[in-house]
Amino acid sequence: MKKITVLFSVICSFFVVLTFLKDGFAGQKENIKDDKEIKAVYISYIELNSYVSGKDEETSKKNITKMLDDIKEFGFNTVIVHVRAFSDSMYKSDYYPVSNTVLNNKNTYPNYDVLEFFIKEAHEKSLKFEAWINPFRISNQTSLDNVSIDSPYYKFIKNKDAAVIEGKGVYLNPASYEVRELIVKGIEEIVKNYDVDGIHFDDYFYPDKKIDLHSYEKYKKDGGILSLEEYRLENITTLIRNVYEMIKVTKENVKFGIAPEGNIQNDYENSYLDVKKILASKGYVDYIMPQIYFGFENQTRPFKETLDEWNNMIKDESIKIIPALAFYKIGTTDKYALSGKNEWIENSDIIKRQILYSKSVSNYNGFSLFRYDYIFNENKYNENTKKEIKSLKEIINND
């Protein structure tokens, strides 16, 4: 009887240990899920032009590694890298020409896959990597001199689905089904072939109010009933829904998010992004990263009220808000802030306070800073920058 009692105790202990281990490992998995607070930095085509373009292989790799080391050592955990800034590609694509931002000192693509190297280095440093896409922009100049002969511009100009827009550059037509199909295929290529953690759009959607007039005229002739404004909003919503669906079918764990302009009225009236619709239900984005590049004292768009407005538009709890913050404004006059124009000069802890306030909103999941050079390139520092960096490090590393 004593032996049976001992055996029973051993068996019970075994199951207790198993239960503990199971719960323990489940807890570990939970801790590394996607709910982790995002602390992101943008690496734009401007940084790529400075540190990768025109460099030999050794130097470009060294510079990429340094950027990622800087970001990791500061305390960030995510990089948002310009993989397709001008309807081009950081890698060898079947749909887009190679980007000038990654051509080497011989003006050719280097002997390594730049995107693959970027991702591998980021992941080795425990950094998430999001591929940043500008879907419709081909150039920010009106001259075609720097537009590759392999650019989609030359395919779509035949049907007026590409245009040179005075004062803005060269763009594709958001109303074109074929243009949207190209964009989705180009992103699918990235998601299938590279271990990205996310796909990221910013605020470049409709470039002007003329590019799609011929498309709308045909739409009306074919029996379309939407107003011009509704038509444009639906074109962008359709693209976003198609990108989201493709990503979830291809690799469900890859996130999709958008960084629209912080001014919601401009999103509707200029970019034709229906932010209320895409934040109302699942199926469009995993996160929204509004560019709230405003100080607390901004006369027309004060930071707190603007962030609250964005947060309150989210109606599905699976969608998170990750405000993008204007590190580049530190120590400068913000003339558009009107009565609050000197706020960034008179204060040196604005970013810190913005992050702390952001943490209080219900759908908060992190923040991002625009952009790498303003944080790490001392040539861009001013009197306030180092003070802001010091206060920022205090909260990033104490979380």
Language-model features and meaning:
Residues K55-F74, T101-K125, L182, E234-L239:
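Aromatic- and glycine-enriched glycan-recognition loops and surfaces
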